[in-house]
């Protein structure tokens, strides 16, 4: 029983761990942008690092189980590299620069809802509002997104949970938010919305691709390699300054290495496994937790204050996530019960014998013997 419970907890622990990784990436990436890092170059180096890290494991560990590459598979992998490494990441970076990190991160929390809608359209998820489990997934998704929006749109009074010695150093940081009012919010909003939509599409296409190419490490290697090629081409077109490619011991290099190893290599692999086992909706349902983790890391590391809106939103997110996970768990229970029921159906072997002037039908494994004279 312990092993069974642990198997159910592993995907949850893995996805929650990824949220810590993403929170760290947001902080490091913002620092690198402030020091002049170009987002096209960052996306390119990020996938160079990810490919180098993942390739040895994929080539060695999956050499016997790796499916043969075909043109349809190659085109799917090319589309995956186009959707997430190129479009999603660069659109998000553009949106974050045009608006603000807080504003753009709020839209990330729409990812579970968009993924759920796409999953229903492509019949990966089924919805029957007469069933409690389906209703729980729909309501839970709405509550999760709503809670994340509350954290962003309703600030409320500051609540100082931890008294820090560095509080006074960050007292003037609140004025920085006013700087974003002069920026192009329309362009930024459209860019972030496009980013989240392509990310959701990536999860859906990945779930289909895994059915044809069930070698997670190899798939991640191919996605990262495609991301490297596509981002390199885009960078050569969009970035004219050769010095932007310069690599040094700075925040830009740290951002590329960290995001490449943690948020591309490890994240793609973990997400592939969880998607195969629990589906794309379950995988994306935990993304709003990144905002909560970032808020608490901000308190501990940057001596920031948590506001009432953040606490209220966090409570909503927890309830929403519980509702979605409960609905998915019920789906799995129903699926297992149906499989067991199919296996337990009686198999009847009917033999027919001709005896004299009549026909005798005998059911060996069943309950009845019928004789026709």
From Swiss-Prot:
Location(s) in or outside the cell: Membrane
Superkingdom of source: Eukaryota
Membrane topology: Multi-pass membrane protein
InterPro entries according to UniProt: EamA_dom (IPR000620), WAT1-related (IPR030184)
One Gene Ontology term of the molecular function aspect: transmembrane transporter activity
Keywords: Membrane, Repeat, Transmembrane, Transmembrane helix
Principal cellular location given in the protein's record: membrane
TM regions (residue ranges): 11-31, 41-61, 67-87, 102-122, 139-159, 185-205, 219-239, 255-275, 281-301, 306-326
GO (cellular component) term, any one: membrane
Keyword Zinc-finger among UniProt keywords: no
All residue ranges annotated as the EamA domain in the record: 23-151, 198-325
Any Pfam family matching the protein: EamA
Entry's family note: Belongs to the drug/metabolite transporter (DMT) superfamily. Plant drug/metabolite exporter (P-DME) (TC 2.A.7.4) family.
Protein name, UniProt field: WAT1-related protein At4g08300
Taxonomy of the source species: Eukaryota, Viridiplantae, Streptophyta, Embryophyta, Tracheophyta
